[in-house]
Amino acid sequence: SYVLADNDAREAVVVDPRSRDLPVLQALLGERDLRLRWVLRTHQHDHLLTHELERLRSMGAPVVQGETREGTHTVADGERLPVGHESLRVITTPGHTAGCLSFAWRDRVFCGGLLAVDACPHQPHPADPAALWDSINLRLFTLPDETLLFAGHEQRARAVSTVLEQRRWHPFFARQTRDAFLARVAALPTHAAAAATMAPGHNIPSA
């Protein structure tokens, strides 16, 4: 979960809040006397839809996501979402899920499950590997080198990197052709295969 706030205007936005974080987030907003302007979701998975969406709507702000669902606010590429005297720019970045979004604010981008720092794509299979390649290379890696990328999943305790670092060193995208990437992703195990081969007591990575 990420929180951005304009303290002068007393408005805030939360990005990808997890259900277990909601009490803490609501306490933080109350303590700082902040009005929640938006709940932003970079992506959602159908098996989490009903429970998660109901809890997010209970926060009292519009829920923004790429997939059109009753009770959510759908946005377009390039749209600006005001937060006090600031705004976040919507970037459509499909691939991890069909409706995956990223949100840019100043020199940083919140990209959720689209890109894990120095790690393979999550799920373990992206919904659309070709779209994922295009989103990473054409939407994220074309941003200024110093742009900070805030991922939705930690890898070795890291969830933040830069465009330059990931463009140069990401094991799935740096110095890779599109065809090589697609072949590599196709060879990744499915959830079912991973579950069959993992020892008891281990968890399958999820997105």
Regions picked out by a protein language model, each given a short descriptive name:
Residues S1-L36, G71-A151:
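Catalytic core of the metallo-beta-lactamase
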Residues S19-Q65:
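Active-site metal-binding motif and surrounding structural segment of the metallo-beta-lactamase
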Residues E31-R32, R57-S58, A127-D128, Q166-W169:
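Glycine-rich, phosphate-binding/catalytic loops in enzymes
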Residues H43, R69-E70, E154:
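Conserved beta-strand edge residues that scaffold enzyme active sites
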Residues H45, L49, A98, L115, ...:
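Active-site His/Glu-centered metal-binding helix of metallohydrolases
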Residues L56, T68-H73:
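Short loop/helix-cap segments at secondary-structure boundaries that form the rim of catalytic
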Residues A131-A207:
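Accessory terminal helices/loops
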